[in-house]
Amino acid sequence: MSTSTATIQDQIAALQNRIKELKVSKQDASKEVEEMKALKDQLKASQKDGGPSTSNLLSLKTPKGTLDHKPEAALLRKKIFSTLEGIFLKHDASTIDTPVFELKEILAGKYGEDSKLIYDLADQGGELCSLRYDLTVPFARYVAMNGISSIRRYHIGKVYRRDQPVMTKGRMREFYQCDFDIAGPCDPMVYDSEVLRVLCEALTSLDIGEYTVKINHRKILDGIFQLAGVPAEKTRPISSAVDKLDKLPWADVKKEMTVEKGLDEAVADKIGEYVGLKGPGPEVLQKLQSDEALMGIPLAKQGLADMEILFRYLKVYNVLDKMSFDMSLARGLDYYTGIIYEAIHESSAPPSLKTIPSVPAPSSINTDAPSSKPKSSKSAATTNEDGIDESTVGVGSIAAGGRYDNLVGMFAEATGRKAEQVPCVGVSVGVERVYSIMEMRRRKGEEKVRGKETEVFVLGLGGVELEKRMEFATMLWDAGIKTSFSPKVNPKAPAQWKQADDDAIPYVAILAPKELAAGTVRIKEQVGKDAAGDAKGEEVKIEEVVAYLKQKLGRA
């Protein structure tokens, strides 16, 4: 008897979810991909033979660019959130929350070329709404709407983008961001430097390995465009093209500027003299300040003065060595007005682009060089459902931000009120990309992640009744200790040990008739430096168990 169409459809959906999971964890999915192709062929053949249509069948899978988070993944994200929240609170921040969808007009015109990635919702009751693209614009709307002049806030929440997803690199359509922003007036670069200090604290505390913070200033970049002769209406589109220099060689970026965006070739060549410059902040700053033509542009001169102050403060904060002054960093979002930055992890560059030399120094840029887009060989294991070879895509920036002084005033002005400027600066950490790095390390055995936070498993031996285990667990729960036990009335010892081992629970409380009669239990350490030498466990008086466990758990 042939497999039913519905069964085949269920198998395909299950395989699609399995392939997603394997790709996220950097495992080979070629076997599952081939199996899914065979099932799809079988499904087509079934329909040709007069089998039922699949149009009315339910496809059990998550939408493209989204994932279910299993216990281990959810717990790892919780760890990331907790680490970041602790740092934000240390810097005097309060948290807020905003709706996941905003009025469409609130988001319109804030994201430049990325506006096409906004999810628009169907009309509901006469209001046109869109899912939020980031947490920054809703924050500015919140500040303007409530007449706030000064606030330090952090916000952890989901955002949505109609991007081409690359699951293994944390590039999703639904993902978490963790934002820290300071709104309010300050002397030049005081808040900017603190936000960069917060960013470095966050990435160091997450222990994800080496990273670099690329930094630039919108006024310097706009000054370069002015010096080169870029028409005002082309400033943002050309800025967006420059921002691609971390992914494409100069020849390709120049082609986009001249062929696609209509920029004069001589103007593009002039831009090319500057955008290849990057390195330690003070060195690049000195080089730019010695450029008389650039210093003759007031906008650029002001930006360079800001950077001089910023680097001085970053040295005080002990994070200057993490910065790279990179003239190719542009950030495509329209609302930035001052410094801009992106944090790049050591694993960010995809293998195929690591072989392309970085953009050369200004004096040696060959603007006539041919395009050198890397070739990639696609395989079933690395090519996703959109035909993107995931092995050629890097993790990308793991955090980004900058100064945006006009956004709050823009909202206030749009309501007809007096446009009060509330200067703002902030940073956003991309949780999914940080998670993908930590998940890679976990798969390599560098990071251990559990699916539960249970601290003690109550194990009964020798026919100890369920009520005794319940009573003991209740005592631990009342003391705030995370505890579990077998739900069976008469569980077998091997099954109980297996449950404790499978969940990697660090301590087991062994309840046995002899010890209970003496008013004691045995506490055995399962995970940790003392576990190997703790074969039988330590006998502890029942009235002292809570204090003993809290001391072991570091909560004494």
Label each residue range with its predicted role.
Residues 213-224, 229:
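Glycine-rich, mobile lid/loop segments that gate access to catalytic sites or pores
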Residues 3-10, 31-34, 233, 248, ...:
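Alpha-helix boundary/N-cap detector
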Residues 76-91, 102-105, 135-147, 151, ...:
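Positively charged, Gly/Ser-enriched RNA/tRNA-binding surfaces
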Residues 2-3, 9-76, 122, 231, ...:
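Auxiliary tRNA-acceptor-end handling modules of aminoacyl-tRNA synthetases
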